């Protein structure tokens, strides 16, 4: 693309996990037909692509301008765990959210699975220069058991109702906080009783939504996978037994390895007051590659996600 044009994206497919997009040039004059020739990834086949009005079409097209020849052609990248409209302190304004989304587009991300945000970003759907977004509504957590200003905070008896609410405000996903530090126990612990978690997941499924959950520990993902959850975020505590059940049920995993690199600094902050938690976080970090490799080798569906937003900067999916 030339420097004075902006990318616009046309959605071709959507199954809840993936989109396929085609970038085109934004022009005030009628869009010209384009020809692109190169090696198309991931197949590695050299092909000619023809673009009419920003959309891939069957060619050839008479009079089409060659936009690129002898190049590599790749689809837009997908960030399966991202947070548009969120920073370290909670919800951000539209201007900041716009900047976050533009950063993702400039670095190649054309589809974002937003894994929880306190901001309403549906205005992005009307912007052709920004990535498409599949939203999970707002995180759902218990009071004082997650990052301040991030989540809809409810007690367990109100979880099903909150899942109902977030399922209706999202785009087919609901995001639970599966575990967090329990300050009374001094370590990671699940947020939800198993029976209530299962009832909440069942309600989401009744509404046609899938459920995913933030999980660092061993206990929470085991409980939630048994309860019928569709995906696990982070997954540093996955055991062999949990992995086997995930494979059997087709449960996805988004490891967010960029986020997991922060575990040592989190542990260092907890050393004095919560030594058990600090040691646990260091253990999870030390075994992160082994754990994710086991899930991969077993056949768990794994998706790339950065956890951008909050304290992780945007535009890192290629990393």
Residue positions per predicted region:
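Active-site environment of divalent metal-dependent phosphoester hydrolases
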Residues: 85-87, 118-123, 141-143, 180-183, ...
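Divalent-metal coordination cores built from histidine and acidic residues
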Residues: 7-21, 94-209, 251-260, 266
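Histidine-centered catalytic micro-motifs
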Residues: 75-87, 204, 211-216, 232
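Active-site loop ensemble at the mouth of alpha/beta enzyme cores that anchors a bound cofactor
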Residues: 256, 263-280
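Glycine-enriched alpha-helix->loop->beta-strand junction motifs that scaffold or abut catalytic
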Residues: 226-231, 247-253, 271-272, 299-301
């Amino acid at each position: 693309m030339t420097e004075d044009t902006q990318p616009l994206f046309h959605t071709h497919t959507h199954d809840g996990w993936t989109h396929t997009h085609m970038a085109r040039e934004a022009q005030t004059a009628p869009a010209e037909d384009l020809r692109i020739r190169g090696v198309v990834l991931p197949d590695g086949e050299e092909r000619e692509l023809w673009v009419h009005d920003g959309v891939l079409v069957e060619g050839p097209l008479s009079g089409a301008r060659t936009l690129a020849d002898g190049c590599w052609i790749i689809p837009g990248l997908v960030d399966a765990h991202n947070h548009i409209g969120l920073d370290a302190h909670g919800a951000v304004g539209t201007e900041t959210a716009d900047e976050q989304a533009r950063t993702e587009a400039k670095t190649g991300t054309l589809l974002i699975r937003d894994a929880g945000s306190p901001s309403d970003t549906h205005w992005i759907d009307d912007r052709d220069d920004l990535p498409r977004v599949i939203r999970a509504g707002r995180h759902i957590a218990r009071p004082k058991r997650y990052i301040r200003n991030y989540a809809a905070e409810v007690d367990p008896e109100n979880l099903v109702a909150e899942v109902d609410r977030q399922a209706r405000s999202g785009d087919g996903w609901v995001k639970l906080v599966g575990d967090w530090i329990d300050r009374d126990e001094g370590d990671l612990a699940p947020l939800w009783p198993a029976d209530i978690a299962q009832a909440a997941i069942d309600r989401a499924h009744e509404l046609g939504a899938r459920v995913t959950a933030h999980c660092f520990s061993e206990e929470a993902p085991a409980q939630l996978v048994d309860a019928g959850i569709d995906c696990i975020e982070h997954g540093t505590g996955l055991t062999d037994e949990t992995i086997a059940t995930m494979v059997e049920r087709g449960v996805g995993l988004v490891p967010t390895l960029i986020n997991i690199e922060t575990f040592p600094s989190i542990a260092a902050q907890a050393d004095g007051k919560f030594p058990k938690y600090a040691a646990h976080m260091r253990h999870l970090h030390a075994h992160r590659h082994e754990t994710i490799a086991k899930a991969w080798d077993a056949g768990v569906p794994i998706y790339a996600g950065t956890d951008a937003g909050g304290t992780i900067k945007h535009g890192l999916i290629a990393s």
